[in-house]
């Protein structure tokens, strides 16, 4: 049998768009058989036996036969054969007589498909008054001899499928171009004026094998595991998009065992909604499968470890996350995931899989840099690996499976000088941003104002910002939706600017010394004036706070945004602790933005809950000390009227009340 698609005929799925098509085959296997249910309904009960023929009747019959055989010369209507209750669609479309057979003689001779549909002639619709008249006769007995007690219009023989067996399911063979049907989309056939009022099929109907099939089956409710996979793709995947898109991944899962990856995805997805003790079960299963003796060391294992370590890091299990990160790095280097040839060798000739391997390496690269940068406990091991894996493409291309030819780091670094006009993806700019963080982490520990090494790294940061194309200068894509890869790229750039310049700034960090949820406290001595390094960190901290204002669910960002917000808050708090601060209200609003974002993130990540508590506590302490100093200093109130003093104190009380409200415990989902 030729299995290639015939684009001249509609596919089987088209017959199930909306109401099923009225054009169904008289027999699902193409051979004449059981009378269609439409013909059964239209024929009704068998007629009574005719009376014995008389001479008059015999003569009339002979005359009718003669009249039928010879054309009428007067143009009067010709006498036809016995009246039949319906004509098939083929005869109707050609305006020919039909003998009502199944199949009828014409269709049998032309080898056409003989189909019937109920006529609405004589049908006056349902009664307006639902009360039955007891003096009227009820419906005739059903075919099996039992009376029909259903008085509703569902029992009306004008509606197909009422109280009788239903026809076979529509199939591709049921479509007959010879029926003269206009070339309209199949989805509109059921809505044509001639048949729009008919109940064509009742559910369930019979399939080709005679089995009952529900044409509108109710979708079974999702299991917790399935909901967790969907949650993973909605919340976690946009921030770390290395695994295959869902449809591709499920196909791979049918071909080989990737249960360890699915287990890791289920656990990560369970972090975003309440699943009870199932979450711990998912985690134990993921750990057991990842470290099973027979698990293959391949890219799928690296992906599973990457997901788990990110989840653990956001759940305040940083040491355990670092252990898994070390294992993932070792396996990635052993299998050559960083090499250009890896994607081609292990991609099975499928561009989406090849792209997934490239993304796996670079996402591991970014995560390694973020862990090293925000926690300052590791040294960004993968930064020293000479990698030539292709750079990832845009997110919409990856999800659609339209993978372009990959570009490489050499193309990115030499873009301006080569004369080539390349368009790099947001993921590529994210990689470039984390490389600048790696350069900063390779600086000597002791730096001093005017150090050329600091200036060199700042040149990288500034060049990254200045040479962004117009479409990448904010975190929105061309559809005005959040571009999470550019969001992270900007986030890393601002965080790197703070980490680079804070040791040389003149902003005393001691007021925020208790904010240690992400990294240990680093003392910065204050100075008499704000130097250029202080300006860098104040600007970067304000830009990070501005990133909170994007109208997207903040829990869809990577959890590393928690530590970047904390870094920004330390700068804000250090500046707010000064005696006189310009734009004091703007600064307080930025602190409130950061605390609000940390509160939202804490519903998923316990690390955010810890950071939020520390930032709130420091903000409360600074506010109290500033308030006490102001009230105890009599000269402070010189020039204020009594009304202004009372108004100022009332405003302070309002701020204090807001901070206390923020200090209320946040219930986390884990």
Curated annotation (Swiss-Prot):
Feature: DNA-binding region: 88-114
Record's compositionally biased regions (Pro residues): 44-54
Record keywords: DNA-binding, Metal-binding, Nucleus, Transcription, Transcription regulation, Zinc
Industrial or biotech use: Iso-A82775C is a precursor for the biosynthesis of the anticancer natural products chloropestolides A to E via a Diesls-Alder reaction with maldoxin. In the absence of the prenyltransferase iacE, siccayne accumulates instead of iso-A82775C and can also be condensed with maldoxin to produce chloropestolides H to K, which show also antibacterial and anticancer properties.
InterPro entries linked to this entry: Transcription_factor_dom_fun, Zn2-C6_fun-type_DNA-bd_sf, Zn2Cys6_DnaBD
Cellular localisation: Nucleus
Biological processes, Gene Ontology terms: DNA-templated transcription
Family matches, as PANTHER family: ZN(II)2CYS6 TRANSCRIPTION FACTOR (EUROFUNG), ZN(II)2CYS6 TRANSCRIPTION FACTOR (EUROFUNG)-RELATED
Protein's name in the database: C6 finger domain transcription factor iacK
Organism name: Pestalotiopsis fici (strain W106-1 / CGMCC3.15140)
Gene: iacK
